[in-house]
């Protein structure tokens, strides 16, 4: 089913169980990445800095900011490593990880079965994100099905390409979300589909986007995970308790608030309750 409508409480145990099961299927042999991080005290993390509350450039300081940036820095702090942020794009982020240009990916890349077959990942998700479409307020598009046979902009490598293709839309894929959104404003497509956490704040807070609205419900909501290379079980095992504790302590909820992510994710509340109950 393309558009998820099930309650968060029912979905999270299923998703979490699936993630843990798939991680267990990866190689159990020791990996070199964790050894390298511990020896060099450097952690290379690929992040998207294309704008929005998960990753962008602060216009005042010209430094990276966002929830993904905060999470990368917190992982580095707990590992005793200096964090080197490496900007990536949807079109090249997997290659950067596979080629060893980064140790981890925290790059707006939600879990899918296809991605789980070629990469490794920390089993506990740190967020849950679905897609939405920005369309003109006077557009006749009111449902996802209305996009059939219409030109729709998105990013290359986006997890939304597959469900959009199944809806029968004409995909126009760009290197970044910024280019995709610019194409929408240039009337090159009838909608631009990206993470709801990017689209919603943009439409709510930016004057030049006041003529646009977002579609609901979210398209294909999925868990956001930290990606590793396949078979790096040591790295995953080292990071998973950290992510659980960030849920239990409320750090991730605080990071969501600090970065003004709206609407707030009910998944974070559910995961916090779970790990507090489990004593994680």
Put a short name on every predicted segment:
Residues 30-108:
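Extracytoplasmic small-molecule ligand-binding "clamshell" domains
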Residues 31, 81-85, 109-111, 115, ...:
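A conserved helix-loop-strand patch within extracytoplasmic ligand-binding domains
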Residues 31, 159-175, 211-214, 243-280:
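Ligand-binding clefts/hinges and TM-proximal coupling segments of bilobed small-molecule sensing domains
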Residues 34, 66-67, 116-126, 212-216, ...:
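A structural signal for short loop-to-beta-strand junctions that line the ligand-binding cleft
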Residues 49, 127-135, 196, 200, ...:
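Periplasmic-binding protein-like
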Residues 66-78, 141, 145-146, 150-151, ...:
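Extended ligand-binding regions for polar small-molecule ligands
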Residues 84-95, 157, 172-186, 220-222:
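Short helix-initiation/N-cap motifs at beta->coil->alpha
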Residues 95, 109-117, 163-166, 190-220:
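A ligand-binding cleft/hinge motif common to bilobed small-molecule-binding domains
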């Amino acid at each position: 089913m393309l558009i998820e409508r099930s309650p968060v409480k029912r979905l999270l145990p299923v998703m979490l169980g699936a993630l843990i099961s798939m991680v267990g299927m990866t190689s159990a042999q020791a990996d070199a990445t964790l050894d390298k991080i511990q020896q060099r005290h450097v952690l290379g993390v690929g992040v998207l800095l294309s704008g929005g509350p998960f990753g962008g450039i602060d216009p005042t300081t010209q430094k990276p900011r966002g929830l993904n940036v905060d999470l990368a820095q917190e992982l580095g702090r707990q590992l005793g490593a200096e964090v080197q942020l490496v900007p990536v794009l949807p079109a090249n982020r997997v290659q950067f990880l596979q080629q060893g240009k980064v140790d981890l990916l925290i790059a707006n890349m939600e879990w899918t079965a296809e991605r789980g077959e070629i990469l490794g990942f920390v089993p506990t998700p740190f967020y849950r994100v679905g897609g939405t479409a920005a369309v003109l307020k006077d557009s006749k598009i009111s449902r996802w099905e209305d996009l059939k046979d219409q030109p729709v902009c998105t990013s290359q490598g986006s997890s939304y390409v597959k469900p959009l293709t199944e809806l029968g839309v004409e995909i126009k894929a760009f290197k970044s979300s910024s280019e995709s959104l610019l194409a929408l404003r240039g009337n090159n497509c009838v909608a631009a589909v990206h993470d709801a956490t990017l689209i919603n704040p943009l439409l709510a807070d930016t004057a030049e986007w006041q003529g646009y609205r977002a579609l609901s419900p979210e398209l294909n909501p999925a868990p956001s995970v930290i990606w590793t290379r396949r078979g790096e079980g040591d790295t995953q095992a080292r990071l998973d308790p950290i992510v659980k504790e960030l849920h239990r302590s409320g750090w991730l909820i605080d990071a969501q608030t600090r970065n003004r992510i709206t609407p707030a994710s009910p998944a974070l509340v559910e995961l916090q309750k779970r790990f507090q109950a489990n004593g994680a």
